[in-house]
């Protein structure tokens, strides 16, 4: 398998987990608008 794809998938999973933790938390969300406003 291609290790680069695995790394990209791991990074995406980490971002999802960070988003789940951060975005409900107003100070974190305010510090990371790109993380939390990605749908817009």
From Swiss-Prot:
UniProt-annotated location(s): Secreted
Keyword Lyase included in the entry's annotation: no
Pfam families on file: Toxin_8
Domain of life: Eukaryota
Summary of the tissues where the protein is detected: Expressed by the venom duct.
GO cellular component, one term: host cell postsynaptic membrane
Propeptide, chain numbering: 1-19
Disulfide bonds: 22-28, 23-36
Gene Ontology MF, one: toxin activity
Chain positions covered by the region annotation Lacks the Ser-Xaa-Pro motif that is crucial for potent interaction with nAChR: 24-26
Keyword Disulfide bond in record: yes
Alphabetic keyword roster: Acetylcholine receptor inhibiting toxin, Disulfide bond, Ion channel impairing toxin, Neurotoxin, Postsynaptic neurotoxin, Secreted, Toxin
The record's note on its domains: The cysteine framework is I (CC-C-C). Alpha4/7 pattern.
Family in the record: Belongs to the conotoxin A superfamily.
Function: Alpha-conotoxins act on postsynaptic membranes, they bind to the nicotinic acetylcholine receptors (nAChR) and thus inhibit them. Has possibly a distinct nAChR binding mode from other alpha-conotoxins, due to a different three residue motif (lacks the Ser-Xaa-Pro motif).
Protein name from the UniProt record: Alpha-conotoxin-like Qc1.1c
Organism: Conus quercinus (Oak cone)
